[in-house]
């Protein structure tokens, strides 16, 4: 008999097996990455990328990724894949980024584009669906961008989400669900979540109902004056007041007393139902969490100091698969990466001390020679 644990494990394996992976990139095949990634030539001054694991790493091959190489440059590179729509599905976007140069000002975010992106001409004005990831500049800007594109406008999450600012590799994950919830994870830990509607101020774009002031198809029957109309409005016993001024008060008319039970005749009494009106910015529920033609992922950013490494790109519809992929990549190398950095730091400290001691000894030697020369000169 199959145990409950074995059955549960089998279900988990099956679920991961059924996950749809739209894009996955680890740069494990040497220079073949150049066949998949397109460097934009829109500007001859765009910075260039190389594939490298950097100055320190957890695994020399597994930690290789796209690295920026030139200071004070804009960068633009992208990779395309088979277009898809995430309608009614979860969308997970994940990647790793390492600012080993200790970023002072520059972007570490990615962009997800529609399939009609002109990769050769990609630039800062190219339309994108999603912008996600860290952005650092000075002391003021240390945030995770989550920008979504709706109705020809870019909307940024109104919550401040802080990014990592050290020089190690970090795993960034964005999850958009069809129930209009979202979640942002850093290093596998949830740091922000909520409603797409409210955290992007999109409630005004949702479907609303307005009562119309008039209805074009309303068939109002025209009434006609009844034969004894005057008797309802003239009072034979009434007389004109003595102080009535026709020039100021107008013509005086006899007014009948109110008759209880007076009913209107010849009037359409059907119930009139208001129409449902759609405002100009009308969006259905799914419009707030779906993108019809996702077909490319890329880096379009500015950096003052280069050296950032981007790796382990993933776009899928399965949160569990993304979690397992993160553990199998970043999770396996994060520890050894820190160990290598610590070893290098100790070696640098040791080298600096040796250089200081050498400088000190050389300084004493020079001072001794100078004194000897001065003493000999005094004897002459």
UniProtKB/Swiss-Prot annotation:
Instruction: Summarize subunit and interaction data from the UniProt record for this chain.
Output: Component of an EIF2 complex at least composed of CELF1/CUGBP1, CALR, CALR3, EIF2S1, EIF2S2, HSP90B1 and HSPA5.
| Name of the protein | Calreticulin-3
The gene is Calr3
* Gene Ontology CC: endoplasmic reticulum lumen; nuclear envelope
> Would you say which domain of life the source belongs to?
Eukaryota
Which key words tag this protein in UniProt?
Chaperone, Differentiation, Disulfide bond, Endoplasmic reticulum, Glycoprotein, Repeat, Signal, Spermatogenesis
Which organism was this protein described from?
Answer: Mus musculus (Mouse)
Location (main, coarse): endoplasmic reticulum
**Biological classification of the source:** Eukaryota, Metazoa, Chordata, Craniata, Vertebrata
Q: Which GO terms describe its molecular function?
A: calcium ion binding; protein folding chaperone; unfolded protein binding
Residue positions with a glycan = 42, 201
